[in-house]
């Protein structure tokens, strides 16, 4: 998660499916009910978590940094947003425990995951050539899908899982059958995505790894990762069914196609606040429609510069019925 306006606690809007202003009050209330996370906590003998000290609207309690391994040499996953309190915690933790960092792995480019890199390099200059990220920036090292990073007691395998961002990587801790899920699966709530179809495919790829535990970049540890991923996929598939059902209702009323605004009204009703409709629901349903279009299940035509969506499945059903009627008439003649 990151912010286009430079607020390290925010989230960079990519498809505007979530809007900080529209959901400010809601998110504040949601955050107030989140469980407390200690600043530093040994989660397992191999995984130490340091909280990013960047709690915010879209970072939940803050971005989790994970220090992985059992010996002196260890690996860091994600670097928070570069808050002074975070780097002080990192420095104190490494010193007190006699830890040396050999690799820094970044799940993706968002500033609340990469912002601490300059401070790490300033304090530990040897890390300059050991910052790893998919689609790397200058002076960073590339990560390949399936690449292995190993230290004493920990073998980490990289897994390309785009959707939240194109460069998004997850990391599998082989010894624990656990996965660092980045922002794809959160400890609480649901992540925003760049591309819904790609995101759903990545969730399935993640599920196929059969990892038991999820270490999310935001929120608490996920004790049953397969159930969490399955629930997320089920929810997204339910949204697809809602959209297709709405288009079917329009067709039943004699309307072949419908605009995005009308589809949102069909699904959620008339009693919608305009900001909620315009800044959240319409962009989200538009993303679902684009995903369904990519699957060949819906299409649109432009009328007066406005996209009007229709179900290709309904079109095929109507065409098939018309063909049957024509065939029956031909036989009768």
UniProtKB/Swiss-Prot annotation:
Induction: Expression is positively regulated by the cluster-specific transcription factor MYCFIDRAFT_198930 and is up-regulated during banana leaves infection. Zn(2+) 2 binds at residues 112-113. The keyword Zinc applies. Pathway: Secondary metabolite biosynthesis. CDD domains: LACTB2-like_MBL-fold. It catalyses: atrochrysone carboxyl-[ACP] + H2O = atrochrysone carboxylate + holo-[ACP] + H(+). GO terms for molecular function: hydrolase activity; metal ion binding. SMART domains: Lactamase_B. SUPFAM superfamilies: Metallo-hydrolase/oxidoreductase. Binds 2 Zn(2+) ions per subunit. This is Atrochrysone carboxyl ACP thioesterase MYCFIDRAFT_190111. It comes from Pseudocercospora fijiensis (strain CIRAD86).
